[in-house]
Curated annotation (Swiss-Prot):
It is found in: Cytoplasm. The keyword Lipid metabolism does not apply. Pfam families: HGTP_anticodon, tRNA-synt_2b. PROSITE patterns: AA_TRNA_LIGASE_II. SUPFAM superfamilies: Class II aaRS ABD-related, Class II aaRS and biotin synthetases. GO terms for cellular component: cytosol. Signal peptide: none annotated. It is an enzyme of class 6 (ligase). PANTHER family: MITOCHONDRIAL RIBOSOME PROTEIN L39/PROLYL-TRNA LIGASE FAMILY MEMBER, PROLINE--TRNA LIGASE. The lineage of its organism: Bacteria, Pseudomonadati, Pseudomonadota, Alphaproteobacteria, Hyphomicrobiales. The keyword Metal-binding does not apply. InterPro entries: aa-tRNA-synt_IIb, aa-tRNA-synth_II, aa-tRNA-synth_II/BPL/LPL, Anticodon-bd, Anticodon-bd_dom_sf, Pro-tRNA-ligase_IIa, Pro-tRNA-synth_IIa_bac-type, Pro-tRNA_synthetase. This is Proline--tRNA ligase.
Amino acid sequence: MRLSRYFLPILRETPKEAEIVSHRLMLRAGMIRQEAAGIYAWLPLGLRVLNKVCDVVRAEQDRAGAIEILMPTIQAADLWRESGRYEAYGKEMLRLKDRHERELLYGPTAEEVVTEIFRASTRSYKDLPKNLYQISWKFRDEVRPRFGTMRSREFLMKDGYSFDIDQAAARHSYNKVFVSYLRTFERLGLRAIPMRADTGPIGGDLSHEFIILAKTGESEVFCDQAYLDMPVPPPSVDFDDVAGLQGVVDAWTSHYAATDEMHDEAVFAEVPEASRLSARGIEVGHIFYFGTKYSTPMKAVVTGPDGSERPVHMGSYGIGPSRLVAATIEASHDEAGIIWPDAIAPFDVALINLKVGDGACDTACAEIQAALETAGLSVLYDDRDERPGAKFATADLIGLPWQVIVGPKGLAEGKIELKRRASGERETLDPVDLPARIRRL
C-alpha cells in the first residue's frame, strides 16, 4: 500500500481530551476518531489492528473447541425480565421501544439471548458440552466514558458461553477458556496474570480477571513476581485432558495475585519480600462460572442420564478486542510512538523512500515492495514528497515492526538500511537479502 493513496489522518498536536498514552497515540496515529462521548470511528490503520486482534482471539477460541455464532445487538426486554436482570442492571443499559411500543435494549452482554438459543435447540445431556461465542459490538452507557477505547460506551467484545451437565464438567469448560486466554494474550505479545475477581452483576461463585501490568493501569494490583516467568501452554496443549488442564490452571493460580478490590494484605505478607510486586494493571479479560443462575429461571434444561430434567451449568467469558488494542499500546510504546507486537501490527514493514522522484530510489522501492509482498509481508510504502524527518516521525508514531530506509547514498553502494522499531537496532544490507533477513529475525 502506498501511503500517498492511503487514508491516514495523522495529528501533529496531542489532543487535549486525551488523558492516557494509548488514547493520545491512537488519535495522533489516525487510528480512531471520536464521534460522540465514548463512541469512536475506527479508521483504516486502527481497523487493521482491531481485525488482527480478533483473528488471534478467534483462532484460540476455535482451538479450544468453542463455536462461533452471531447474536443480535438489539435484544428483547422480556428475556432480561426472565433472568431477573432487567431492573437490576441499572442506567448503563440503553433501553428503547420500537414503533409498536415493544421494549427493547441495546445489549451490554448476551447471557439471556444465548440461553434462549440453547434452550430452544438442546434437549439431552448427549448434546453437551457446548461453548458458543461471538465477536460483536456492545454498548454500556457509562456515566463518565474516558481513556479512549479503554473505557468507551461502544466497544467490541468477544463473549463466550459454556453449557454443561454438572459442575465438574462446567469447571473443565472454564479451564479450557482460562488456558485459551493465556495463549491468546501471549500471542498478542502480552503477559497477562489471572487474578481472582468479584463476579459483579453477572453473578456466580468463581471468576478470574486477566490483568496486564502497565504504569497507566486503572487498578492497583498485587502479585508474586513468579507469574512474570511462568511458561504459557504451547499450541499442542490437549484441551480434552481434564487432569492436565486442571494442572495448568492450578499452577497459574497457586501464587498470590489480586486487584485492590480483592487484596488481602495479611496473605500478601506471606509472599517472600523479594517476590512481592505492587503495580498498576489493566483488565484485558474476565471469565465467570455461575452455575444455574440463568438456566434455572429461564428453564434451560436437558434430560440427564437418569431421564430427569436438570438445568445446565453455565459460564461466560469475555475479551474486549477494542480495549485490547489500547491496552497493548499502554504496555508497548516509547516517546516516539507505538511499538506494535508482530502479531497485530497493521503492516509488517514501513518502506521509506528518502528521495521520491529519484529514479534509482523509486525503482529500488518498487522492487523491494514487490519482493517483501511476495514473501508474505505487508508493506506501507511512504512515497510522499516529504522531508526525511517527517517520514521517520510517521514511521515511529504508527509503530510498524520494521523500517526499511532507501536513499541515494546507500543505493550508490548497493545497500539499504533496516531498523527494528522495538529495539532501535539498525543494519545495512543488500536489498535482495531483505525478505530472508526479516523472516529470520
